[in-house]
Amino acid sequence: MQLSKHFSLKEMTKSMTAQRRGIDNTPGAGEIKSLGDLCYEILEPLRAHFDKPVTITSGYRSEALCEAIGSKKTSQHAKGQAVDLEIFGVPNIQTAYWLQNNVDFDQLIMEFFDKDDPAGGWVHISYHESGSNRKQVLTFDGKKYSEGLPEMKWSGGKVVN
């Protein structure tokens, strides 16, 4: 089932943990609608801007899958409202900055950020269509969360070390 031009339900629900443990990771109708909203409002604009495929490293997670991986059952992933992503060839911090400045979102987290490796970690982003997106931006360095994205050096619209 296609959720949008470039994103399918299969890629938004794929989980090696679910496959290995025999966990049903099938979303309900409400979660599928939320995944579609996420695709149209966040992922399609992101793909169009960078003109590269967006890799979903974690999308929808059933409550059973959340429990299996140590995530909260109340996670926005369990509601179909969040994804973790990367774009091959684009530093994750650059992706995070673009998202912060160009789309409506609820929460944006630059996960496992290392200033010496702007391509490291991954980007977590969530969206819900209720109109009450918080626009919360955080950076997680593996130990603690901090508000906002880290300051970076830029040249020609790209992150430089």
Label each region the model flagged:
Residues A68-A78, F113-D116:
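Short, flexible, solvent-exposed loop/turn segments with mixed acidic/basic and small polar residues
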